[in-house]
Each structure stands twice: as C-alpha cells, then as structure tokens.
Amino acid sequence: MTASPSKLAQLRELSVVVADTGDYDAIKRLQPVDCTTNPTLVKKALDLPVYADLLERELAWGRAHGGDDRTTTVDEVADRLTIGVGVKLSALVPGRVSTEVDADLAHDTQATIAKARKFVAMYAERGVPKDKILIKIAATWEGIEAARQLQLEGIDCNLTLIFNRAQALACAEANVFLISPFVGRILDYYVAQGQTPASIDEDPGVVFVRTVYNAFKQRGSSTVVMGASFRSTAQIEALAGCDRLTISPDLLEKLDAEHGELPRKLSPGNANNAQITPIDSDSFASGLAADPMATEKLASGIDTFAKDLHALRKTIADKLAG
C-alpha cells in the first residue's frame, strides 16, 4: 500500500514553499523554492561550519581594509557577510533569496534605495543576478515609496512587517513584487490582550492574510502575498493555496512528518482587472493610527530588526578586535 503524501508535499502543490532560515543544511534537506534571511538568521548562520570560510575571509577583509573609522568597517563587513550568505543560499534554491535592508533606514526613502542598489551590485559582482534576489524592506510609507522606485528600476522587493490593510493596499498600488503579512505576530497581540481565538478560522492573523489575498485577487493585483511568522502548522494549513508561505525549518519538518488530507483554503477564484485604490501618505497614516495592533507591531518589528542588526555588527566588531 502506497503511503499518503506528507502535508508538506501536498502544500508544495498549492503554494510556493519558502524557508525562513539561513541554515544551509536545512535548506538543502527541505528543498524550498525560495528562502528569506535577516540579521538574526545571518548571525546564527555564521556559527555553522559551512560558513566558516566566508566568515574568515570577510573578517580578513575587514582587518586589511579597516582604517580609523571602525564603525564603517564593521558595517561593511556586515553587508559583505549578509551578501555572502545570500550568495551561498542562492546556489541551493531554484527561486529567490530575500535580503533585508537595514531596519535603521526604515523611515528614509533615499537611504533605503541606496542600500538596495548597493546590495544588488554586490550580488552582481559575485555572479548572482537581480532576478535571483528580493530586497526586503519594512512596510513604512517611506519604505513603500523606496520600493516603488526600485521596482521601476527592475529591482524586485519584499515588503515585510505587514499588519494592516492600508500597508497592503499601498504596496499593491506601488506595484511591489511581494508582501509578507505576519500571521503569528498579529495573533500574539490579541492573545496578549486576552482575546484567544476559539478556532483557527477566527485566528486574526489567518483572517488578515485571507482578506488581503482575496482583495488582491479580486482587484487583479500582481503583488504576491506571502504569509509569514507562523506559530503553528494549523496556521499554515489554514492558508494552503496562498501564493507563497515562508516557514521556519521546525514547522517544515513537522509538516513533512504529518500525513492526512491538506485541502486548499485559498484560490484566485474569479479574479478581475479592477484597480487598487491609490493611498497617499495621509490615508496611510490614518489607516495605521486607527489600528493599535498594526501601529505597535510595525514599530516593535522595526525595533527588533534594528536590534538584531546591531547584534550582528557587535559580533563582527568583537571578532575583528579579537
């Protein structure tokens, strides 16, 4: 008797599966289409033997090129390591690697554009074309405006920390390639408020992603919806059929070990060519202001990403000094 396919195998038939990790061996084993990275994942990756040569090479570069401005040297080594990890991962996945622009720049459109262009150039110097990468940017108004310009230059962007309909619609109106609504962090907020959902269909993170997905498909938007920040396989299963789902290795392993039917929960349905309503900075700001959850989670998400980047830089500074 033939064993039934795992839920992960079934999910691959419904959604593009993305690995939320820089763990080389995990990606090799789980074979996602894409992968996403951030400073914390890069920092963890550098402890793995497979990245030892990269780490030593870039630290040697830092020592050789370090002048009086130590901060600039550390920042440059952090960028080189981030791109180095991405280059290695790009050889493993058939799709794309998301690489995060500094969270410190979340409210600076021009600086975000400059850093994105730098990352694309660094990848190109290492033989990775821009169609193999996504530039990950926090979905502030300034970040979305940066993505609007980058998309016009042919640089595809992943707008992250999406918690609110205004953010999502602004991204679609800007023709952003992909957005990452954060399922788990939305749930976390409401659970902390004593509002634990009675069922997975009432999970506010799941409901939000379903709402955004359906709105985009009904309006004929080409912006990809990639559910992110999952707390359980139940959340993932509830979004089966979403364009893409970025999932941590531990949850991918659980899905790979589970069997039983995995039904499609989302489908394009009768998509039409209706237009996304333009959103300006005032309506964007008012949309966020009316949503305490989104306001809190966007701010705390940027703060967490910034702290993670500073932790990566501190690790590099300590190693350069050692």
From Swiss-Prot:
Name the species this protein comes from. Xanthomonas oryzae pv. oryzae (strain PXO99A)
User: A GO CC term?
Assistant: cytosol
* UniProt main location, coarse: cytoplasm
Report the catalytic activity: D-sedoheptulose 7-phosphate + D-glyceraldehyde 3-phosphate = D-erythrose 4-phosphate + beta-D-fructose 6-phosphate
Recorded GO MF terms:
transaldolase activity
Question: What family is this protein classified in?
Answer: Belongs to the transaldolase family. Type 1 subfamily.
Q: How does it assemble?
A: Homodimer.
Q: Which gene encodes it?
A: tal
Q: What does the UniProt keyword field contain?
A: Cytoplasm, Pentose shunt, Schiff base, Transferase
User: What sort of enzyme, by top EC class, is this?
Assistant: transferase
Decide whether keyword Cytoplasm is in the record.
yes
EC number of the protein: 2.2.1.2
Pathway the protein contributes to: Carbohydrate degradation; pentose phosphate pathway; D-glyceraldehyde 3-phosphate and beta-D-fructose 6-phosphate from D-ribose 5-phosphate and D-xylulose 5-phosphate (non-oxidative stage): step 2/3
Q: Give the function comment from the record.
A: Transaldolase is important for the balance of metabolites in the pentose-phosphate pathway.
Lineage, highest ranks first: Bacteria, Pseudomonadati, Pseudomonadota, Gammaproteobacteria, Lysobacterales
InterPro entries in the cross-refs:
Aldolase_TIM, TAL/FSA, Transaldolase_1, Transaldolase_AS
Q: What's the name of the protein? A: Transaldolase
Q: Which residues form the active site?
A: K136 (schiff-base intermediate with substrate)
**Record-annotated disulphide pairs:** none
Compartmental location: Cytoplasm
GO BP, one annotated term:
pentose-phosphate shunt
